[in-house]
Amino acid sequence: MNPVAVTSVAPVDIIHDLRHSEHATEASPITLLHVFSRAVSQYPNHELNFITSSAHDSIHTKTFTEFDQYVRALAQAMLAWGKPAGSVIVVYLTEHEDNMAAIWASLFAGYVPCLQPALSAQQAHKEGHVAHIKNLFSSATWLTNESGAEQVQSIPGLDIHLLSELQASAETVSVDFQTHQPHLDDEAILFLTSGSTGFSKAVVHTHRTILAGCNAKGQSYGLTSESKIMNWVGFDHVVGSLGMHITPLLCGASQLHVHASAILSDSLRFLHLIEEKSIQLVFAPNFLLAKLTRDLEKRSDLFGKFDLSSIKRINSGGEAVVSSTAQAFARTLKNLAKDGDASFVFSTGFGMTETGAGCIYDTIDVLGTSPPHEFLEIGTPVAGCEMRIVNPEDGVTPRPDGESGELQVRGPMVFVRYYNNPETTSSSFVEGGWYRTGDVGIFEKGKMRLSGRIKDTVVVHGVSYGIPELETYLQTVEGVAHSFLVAAPYRAPGQETEGFVVFYSPTFDLDSEDAPAKLYATHRALRDVSVKLITLPPQQIIPLTLNQMEKSTLGKLSRARLLNLFKQGELAKYIIRAEELLGIARGANFVAPSTETEKTLAGIYAGIFHLSVSDISTSENFFEFGGTSIDAIRLKREAESAFDLSEIPTIQIFKHPEIITLAKYVDSLVSKDASEEEYDPIVPLQLTGKKTPIFMVHPGIGEVLIFVNLAKYFQNERPFYALRARGFEAGQPCFTSLDEMVSCYAAAIKRTQPHGPYAIAGYSYGGVIAFEVAKRLEVMGSEVQFTGIIDMIPHHMPRSDWTGGLLILSYFLGLVSKQDTNDLAPSMRPLARTEQFEMVWKLSPPERLVELQLTLEKLEHWVNVADSVREFAKKYEACSSVSVLDVFYAIPVRGTKEDWFNNHIKRWASYSRAEPSYVDVPGHHYTLMDFDHVPRFQKIFRARLEARGL
């Protein structure tokens, strides 16, 4: 067959001007600002609607005219910053309206907005990224909110402006000012790449590229001034800002922008909004289609209840769309629709940040036709775009129709360059202006479909993760030969999202007597590292001989070669051998589920850990297997549902981490034979290892879930026990004094570990409890060799009333923002406590309530337990001393880290008989042990234990 290159003819309006520079002169009236002004002039009463992250059930509306006045006032206020025209403004905001306003205000003021995605919670990565951005733009002007400013406040040299302050200034200015008049090829908006293969690149889009792409998309979508679209994608992504805002703005269409949390937490809201607002166009990537289908397909009580007649098109992209997923979703919509004959048109597409969102589309009625492939085709280019398939080795030789190769595109919507990065820009294009997408595609029978990626990333639910970074961490696993490991992106047949395969050479002989046990441990570790880094285990782990893992002359392993061998079945004998050895290892300690309860629990385990039920032994420890605090809540929730139980106390999940013991406990609940257990503060989070155990005291909220992720790092090293406050279970009274609590905890520790030396630590207010317990043990004649204080001070505990305690707990649980804890207190205090609970409840993200399995009653009970502990804190003053202290400190809730350390943390010196060790740890007070920070915290914490001879 002949080589293929496909071109779509451009429409003869805006695109004609944009593609031919001789017509697009400096006097040309076509820029983004003209488009905005035209929309306001022609459709003054059309609407921009917003649903925010904190108010899922209410819609905030501005007409085009009102929004125009708002952003022009912001632009006038921006000019007071005194920045020269063309300055880059890093926009770091979370709400759609705020991002939208920041973009247009920047453009009117003559600045270039750069949309910053959510920053990493890992301090080192965040600081490195911000420093990179500062150097890239040779400036450091940020427009953000209070939360964003808090995240970057520790990074020097930034010129940070708060949106709230800009809004206040805008209220006092006149909007009658001369707005900036850009040229067609001026930089308009910058977008940051994911940084999946290193630091982010800044993609430069000009007025020309944006208008070319948006005009072509608008025609492809069939938008008119009467259209209504719904978007939930953030504005830091080109789909949200260009595809679902500027594109409909070109034709004056009204828009509804919904914060992602509102859709992801409540699938029904997706349908209600389509019905309520008569939405015609929505965007739903493959992972959302799958989620909506899972949530809604069994809701037979809702069949025929929704008027979905307005919806004309469902766009999908970001990752390949599984044909069966699209069909299942369409069937679900049809069942839910009032019109039983309704059909739903899917438009699968391909686009990148560099192409300004979608540039290749296909429309298909997935129920009216049978898709010929596992993944839906992505079709043909939009007007003005060209695409071709070439040999990926040389990047220029066209591939015949039906053969796979590298997808390349060109056209007026393709970005002009990477900001201040000419080398990468040059390498991204080949002769003729073709952009190398890094994707593998096949053009056949007039349609394009994707079949993989060339670049070193794996896409999980639309999010790109860097393969090199993943390999770096996997390489550290014991049992992996140094520099003989690669991970390759791979999408197995039937999978809804992309995954990966790990190839490696083991350090041990697979024919040795202990090979089964070593292989099992190595594969378990590789899986655990993968889940922690990219939330997904490998689809296959394949141990190979060194000869099979051949390297190039430059010492590189070929992912493509190994993946091809795997796909062709050439590695089958290695996979079979590994399974035989793993089977031997599992068989040595494997106990298959026997009772119906055990089988049901094994099924829940398998679902959580992405395994087959046949791989689950009843002797497996849930937390040693990789279970997190969120997994524990999921286990609790699914078990309650499976066994029709109103409550399985969280503490029992910790006390019965093996299926065999949890099944017996569940059976006792079902038969109502469960006896009331005597309170024991000790919660064993992991019991392996021979080194001195660590006892970790709960923070002020009394619960120990925060320690689950940390405990896993002590497997096979030392037992890890947490101490949980009294009062959580029915009939348990709260402690009445700190002395009573300390006496109880000291006795429990002695009962668990009769003889010293002891290692005790506490987080937040748990730090002072740990200090008091250590003192008590020393009075009892025991040696306490390690007393850890994690981000707490020894004097004048912060005093807060009941309302403050409720808000602090709610913030700790992720129900409200830090700003809410300050802003809400004055208005809440006069209210009755029930009304205060209801106010917090309305602000709480529904998905977080589901995640925590929280009800109003449970929250009230939790507040009462925390309030009893808070009463101790109000009266506390440290006295006396212990033999030695290790004090860990992070970014404080208020003030600077420097002040926190010098004027508060260092006062612990008065209460240690030896010079304390002060350790700076990454993160904020409330995040230092979260998923992102715990890998670094555990290294620091374990190093201090070892330094103390433990």
From Swiss-Prot:
Region (Thiolation and peptide carrier (T) domain) residue spans: 597-667
SUPFAM superfamilies: Acetyl-CoA synthetase-like (SSF56801), ACP-like (SSF47336), alpha/beta-Hydrolases (SSF53474)
GO biological process: biosynthetic process
Claim: Transferase is one of the keywords in the record: yes
Keywords: Phosphopantetheine, Phosphoprotein, Transferase
UniProt GO molecular function: acid-thiol ligase activity; phosphopantetheine binding; transferase activity
Span of domain Carrier: 592-670
Segments of this protein annotated with the region Thioesterase (TE) domain: 693-797
SMART domains assigned to the protein according to its UniProt record, in alphabetical order: PKS_PP, PKS_TE
Entry keyword annotation includes Zinc-finger: no
Region of interest called Adenylation (A) domain, as start-end residue ranges on this chain: 37-460
Modified residues annotated as O-(pantetheine 4'-phosphoryl)serine in this record: 629
Pfam family, one: PP-binding
Function: Inactive atromentin synthetase homolog. Does not accept 4-hydroxyphenylpyruvate (4-HPP) as substrate.
Protein family membership: Belongs to the ATP-dependent AMP-binding enzyme family.
Protein name according to UniProt: Inactive atromentin synthetase invA4
Gene, per the UniProt record: invA4
